[in-house]
Every structure is written in C-alpha cells, then in structure tokens.
C-alpha cells in the first residue's frame, strides 16, 4: 500500500510518523511518499491533504498543475483524507467566519459546507475530547488549530464525530475530512480508519 502526502506546507512529518504507527498497528507493509506534482499521484492508493493555509495550498496546487488532477482522481474514487486546511480544500462550499464567501481554489469533491476560522482568533488552538464510537474507537483527545467547522452535510456525506453539536469528522464514500489535526493526537485511530478506507 502506497500513501501520498501533499507536501507544500503543513505537518507532512507528523502525518508521516502517525501513518507509520498506523501501518505497524495494522500490520500493513506500507510506503509513504511526498506529493508535489502530478506525476507523484501515479501509483498511490490513497492521499492525505494536511493542514496549513488552505488558500496557499490551493494556489500552489493550481500553479503546479496538480489541483485538477487531484480532483479527477478523488471523484474517480481515490481515497483521500483532508485535515483542517485539507478538509477546506475538499468542501464544495467554503466561507470565512469574518469575511464570508471565499473564492479560493478548491478540489470541491465533498458535499459539505465549511466555515474557516470558526472558533475565532482568540481560540488559536485548543484540545478537546471527542467520541469516535462511530468509527469503532473510543474517546480521543484531539488538537484544533485555527480550526474550521463543518456546518452542513448533504447527499452521502455523513458526520462521524461532533464537538458541541458541530461536525469535526465527516465521511463521504472515499473521502474523509477532519477539522482537527489527527497527526498531533496521541491516538492513531483516524489514520487507521483512513487505511481501512484505502483497503476497501
């Protein structure tokens, strides 16, 4: 199994280490590769779009010609996990808590609506315990950094975990979106769930 991680910015290293742990836990012989240009998408079984700044990631991906290719592969069934800014990239509708609608480049493959900076600047980062029973796991302490929120889901998109009634983990077919940073968590639960998604 070969997993690609979009490597423009964001926590590539942390996702790499968390994936390695998940591979070990599930006894999977896995390979992890950085993805920057279209040819890097060749022969991968799944892809992770990490956190960072979603507008920057989108603009760089567009400039390097990978944005449309990613969208095509994801809509054709390539398993993807987007975390924080990565979840924003996957959403069909994006607005900002302060400035309203945005016109940033998006993959836009998932039937969710996201509000950027949902918790406000005063809550730059915080930790919270969420219930992962819908993915067959227990409670987990997770990290939110300038986090967005999934405020609406439609079609086949479904909420897998909430915080105070707001969706923080969602799935639609081959797509997994988290508004928190699972790579900074003590548990590999989210990465393990993603690998199950990849295995099919």
From Swiss-Prot:
GO MF: glutaminase activity; pyridoxal 5'-phosphate synthase (glutamine hydrolysing) activity
One cellular component (GO) term of this entry: cytosol
Positions of the catalytic residues: 84, 181, 183
CDD domains, alphabetized: GATase1_PB (cd01749)
Pfam families xrefs: SNO (PF01174)
Swiss-Prot/TrEMBL keywords: Glutamine amidotransferase, Hydrolase, Lyase, Pyridoxal phosphate
Its EC number(s): 4.3.3.6, 3.5.1.2
Reaction equations catalysed: aldehydo-D-ribose 5-phosphate + D-glyceraldehyde 3-phosphate + L-glutamine = pyridoxal 5'-phosphate + L-glutamate + phosphate + 3 H2O + H(+); L-glutamine + H2O = L-glutamate + NH4(+)
Binding positions (L-glutamine): 52-54, 116, 145-146
PROSITE patterns named among the record's database cross-references: PDXT_SNO_1, PDXT_SNO_2
Keyword Phosphoprotein part of the UniProt annotation: no
GO biological process, one term: pyridoxine metabolic process
SUPFAM superfamilies on file: Class I glutamine amidotransferase-like
Matching InterPro entries: Class_I_gatase-like (IPR029062), PdxT/SNO (IPR002161), PdxT/SNO_CS (IPR021196)
Pathway entry: Cofactor biosynthesis; pyridoxal 5'-phosphate biosynthesis
Subunit structure of this chain's protein: In the presence of PdxS, forms a dodecamer of heterodimers. Only shows activity in the heterodimer.
Family: Belongs to the glutaminase PdxT/SNO family.
Function summary: Catalyzes the hydrolysis of glutamine to glutamate and ammonia as part of the biosynthesis of pyridoxal 5'-phosphate. The resulting ammonia molecule is channeled to the active site of PdxS.
UniProt protein name: Pyridoxal 5'-phosphate synthase subunit PdxT
Source organism of the structure: Saccharolobus islandicus (strain M.16.4 / Kamchatka #3)
Lineage, opening ranks: Archaea, Thermoproteota, Thermoprotei, Sulfolobales, Sulfolobaceae
Gene that this sequence comes from: pdxT
